[in-house]
Amino acid sequence: MDKLAIQASPPLAGDVIISGAKNAALPILMAGVLAETDFVVSNVPNLRDVSTSCKLLRCLGADVDELGEGKIRISTKNLNEFCAPYDLVKTMRASILILGPLLARYGTADVSLPGGCAIGARPVNLHLHGLEMMGAKIEVKEGYIKARVDGRLKGAHIFMDMVSVGATENLLMAAALADGETVIENAAREPEVIDLANCLIAMGAKITGVGSATLRIQGVERLQGCEYRVMPDRIETGSFLVAAAVTRGRIRCLKADPASLESVIAKLEDAGAKITTGEDWIELDMEGKRPKAVNIKTAPYPGFPTDMQAQFCVLNVLAQGTATITETIFENRFMHVPELIRMGATMELEGNTCIIQGIESLSGAQVMATDLRASASLVIAGLVADGKTIVDRIYHLDRGYEHIEQKFQGLGAHVERVQ
């Protein structure tokens, strides 16, 4: 099984090209099921979850051609299966996003209950409740969600009890082909939801309120394929910016989207980073200084993203001062803390808050990745730890970061993949 071996590295320096956003690419690939003609998606990152999504679409009978350079073509003319099996779904929570498109277009879907990162309950009840309001008959048995609808789904007024990105995306896709108007209130406002909505509009969907907490979807008879480019990955961008800050370096993230990262950029500036942005690039310069501790509280967009929490834990571990990090989105999302403590970090958990006393340095150690973003934080910690750090179970990392060791090497980091 692959591991990453990391040696203490110099301050990161240079340019890094940001990949397409995993969390936008996955729902957009699932949206291909809604299209009656060929659908081409570009800027798709080469990741394990993307490969799993393509396998799932092929399992349903869709023709999926990987055209190279991050471009994928999907044709549904031979789609004739409506079951997303356990073997595929167990490795990736985003598989649940096939439910809405299958049900809306074909009236039937059997989807295994999902797997993915082990970071809390992430219930699917919001997805199911919304689809039931649109007329679906749903039962959960033998580990599968079995959904049926006679004719077409019907437009409905859906109020989400809590903000959920996945449920918003599933209901948005289902509503695009429903009969009549659907209103989704308390909808997620994440940039990836906006990207999906813009993709659906390019396919012929009628959606208003994009980017707000109230989405209005006027169902249409059919959707056509189009060519669509996935947005840049804001979490990958943020991860490299934090790595540069922790190593007191200076980097530029190219093909990035500064507008989607405002909360992260603000916290990096609070930590002492000098940040300059252009339309599609972000430069961070620590000017050789140690970062200052910053308090973080995660929140739905436009608040601070939960997917950047672990990386800022590492920043605060090596910062000047004491900080608190409060996680409000997922329970069980501090699994990186015991690993960082093994490297010498001074951290204490109190409920959903981590109290961190900044120290001068860490010690290299063998550590274990527990989920996608926790693994990124351990890599960043390894860059500034004395001696050698081995990060085990990096299949988590490969689910969300494209060519991570090559990108770090390009910035001067001592990182290599080993068996």
Swiss-Prot record:
Keyword RNA-binding among UniProt keywords: no
**Record protein name field:** UDP-N-acetylglucosamine 1-carboxyvinyltransferase
Q: Which domain of life is it from?
A: Bacteria
Which pathway, metabolic or otherwise, does it act in? Cell wall biogenesis; peptidoglycan biosynthesis
Its UniProt entry gives the catalysed reaction(s) as: phosphoenolpyruvate + UDP-N-acetyl-alpha-D-glucosamine = UDP-N-acetyl-3-O-(1-carboxyvinyl)-alpha-D-glucosamine + phosphate
State the EC number(s).
2.5.1.7
Classification via NCBIfam families: murA, PRK09369.1
Which GO BP annotation is one of this protein's? cell wall organization
Q: Which SUPFAM superfamilies does the record associate with it?
A: EPT/RTPC-like
Q: Which Gene3D superfamilies match?
A: Enolpyruvate transferase domain
Catalytic residues per the record?
C117 (proton donor)
Binding positions for UDP-N-acetyl-alpha-D-glucosamine per the UniProt entry = R93, D307, I329
The UniProt keyword set, sorted, is: Cell cycle, Cell division, Cell shape, Cell wall biogenesis/degradation, Cytoplasm, Peptidoglycan synthesis, Pyruvate, Transferase
What this chain does, per the record? Cell wall formation. Adds enolpyruvyl to UDP-N-acetylglucosamine.
Has the keyword Mitochondrion been applied to this entry? no
